Design a protein with these regions (language model features):
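A broadly conserved sequence feature marking short terminus-proximal activation segments
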Residues: 1-18, 24, 236-256
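Iron-sulfur cluster-binding cysteine motifs and their immediate structural context
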Residues: 2-9, 15-40, 45, 49-65
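Alpha-helix N-cap/helix-initiation motif
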Residues: 13, 43, 156-160
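Iron-sulfur-associated redox domains of electron-transfer enzymes in respiratory
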Residues: 62-256
Length: 256
């Protein structure tokens, strides 16, 4: 199965210390037999543990941020933002909306609303089918792990769209003005790129890490921007979706 590369190795920085292999949950995607470790992308689940562990800066996530910045002023673009923005840009998530619109993004949507739709479908699936086990699937690394290494778990993956997919489909259906707009997806996850390619929705995968690095490099202060507002209805509970227990807290809305 061909998988888009989401993690790169800088050969000049890699010292072949194998820290990346030690923390990798699947091991097989790494080849440490040369002077530097290489990645077999078709076996990499894209979890990013190796990036965190590499003290030499030899591993980086691959996203579309540079391409997005090149094209944003010349294309019709909207952005959707993951609930994790409240953690990655603590206290400045609303200013991020204003910054995005200042560079040419026409509309910004909160994925928390899509997370509530996803959770609703989880609850409906459980009530209807009474499965022995349900594995939530917002994380593409988990999905890839099941597909590549534990196929016996595939039957337990929730047969529902992810919060990102729900949000994009909601925009296409209820906001016809943006039907032909490019969609920039802002999240902590490099592996999300694979999901968007599979469902053929989403054009730019932008990691919050690379976005924060850009702000630091260019001395952009988000607190100098006014608070912006999302262009979709606010979520009731799923703003905490990315925190421990966030999914269950959201599910309580649908379970009396």
């Amino acid at each position: 199965m061909a998988l888009t590369p989401v993690i790169s190795v800088d050969q000049e920085k890699c010292v072949n210390c194998h820290r990346c292999i030690a923390v990798c949950p699947v091991k097989l995607c790494n080849d440490g037999s040369k002077d530097y470790v290489t990645i077999r992308h078709e076996l990499c689940i894209g979890c990013g543990k190796c990036i965190e562990s590499c003290v030499h800066g030899a591993r980086r996530g691959i996203d579309d941020f540079e391409l997005f910045m090149q094209n944003v002023k010349n294309e019709n673009v909207l952005a959707i933002v993951a609930p994790a923005v409240a953690v990655s840009f603590r206290g400045k998530d609303k200013q991020l909306i204003s910054w995005l619109k200042s560079i040419g993004v026409e509309a910004v949507f909160d994925v928390s609303f899509g997370a509530e739709l996803t959770t609703k479908t989880y609850v409906e699936h459980i009530k209807k089918n009474n499965p022995r086990l349900v594995i939530a699937q917002p994380c593409p690394a988990i999905v890839s792990y099941c597909e590549l290494y534990q196929p016996e778990l595939l039957e337990y993956l929730a047969p529902c769209d992810s919060p990102m997919a729900h949000t994009m489909k909601m925009i296409k259906k209820f906001y016809p003005k943006y039907e032909n707009y490019k969609i920039a997806v802002i999240s902590p996850c490099y592996a999300k790129k694979r999901e968007y390619e599979e469902i053929k929705l989403g054009d730019y995968n932008i990691s919050m890490k690379n976005l924060a690095e850009y702000f630091s490099l260019h001395d952009i202060k988000l607190d100098t921007f006014e608070n912006g507002t999302y262009d979709n209805p606010p979520a009731e509970r799923a703003v905490m979706y990315s925190t421990p227990g966030g999914l269950m807290q959201t599910a309580e809305r649908f379970v009396p």
